[in-house]
Amino acid sequence: IQGEGKTVSGDESISWGCGDIFVLPGGERQIHQASKEMAILWVVTNEPQLAFENLQGPEKGAAPTEMIHYPASEIKKQIELIYKVGRGDDIAGSALIFSSSMQEETRNVLPTLTLAMNSLPAGGSQRPHRHNSVAVSLVIKGENCFSMIDGERKDWAPWATTVTPPVSVHSHHNEGDEHS
């Protein structure tokens, strides 16, 4: 979210900056260190799921994904490409799906975790839809945006984390002047 730094996972390391996304394999010690100024990271793991199901993380070297780094500049380029291509009425929304070579077939970053960056054009809406699993979202930019979840309006706020329960019918709306 803010700052820059370095992350070490096992024998690998990446240097990251504001807006970058990275995926780390389990089973390794991980160290995050800011460079000069304070950094803020938004971290999502499948550790709660593993604990709930009474499972252990993978053994060292047996993780279902590798260390992956998606720089903000490449993410921006891909989002712009999505807007260039456009979308038809049959498409629920515009999303950049992140995956890894090990999870490419399922379009996930982990066997049970999908990572996507959704975007709505100014004045746009995403039709009502539902997911079979929970959706955890980080609002990056959302002035005058909101979601309708099971008929209830939820206004967006920058850097807020939202949780949409499984099978809840929901839609997203941008009444602002910029894409979200």
Regions found by a protein language model. Name each.
Residues 51-116:
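A short, N-terminal "cap"/entry segment at the start of jelly-roll beta-barrel domains
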Residues 111-114, 133, 166:
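Exposed loop/turn and edge beta-strand positions of beta-sandwich/beta-sheet ligand-binding modules
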Residues 143-180:
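Extended hydrophobic/aromatic segments used for targeting, binding, or gating
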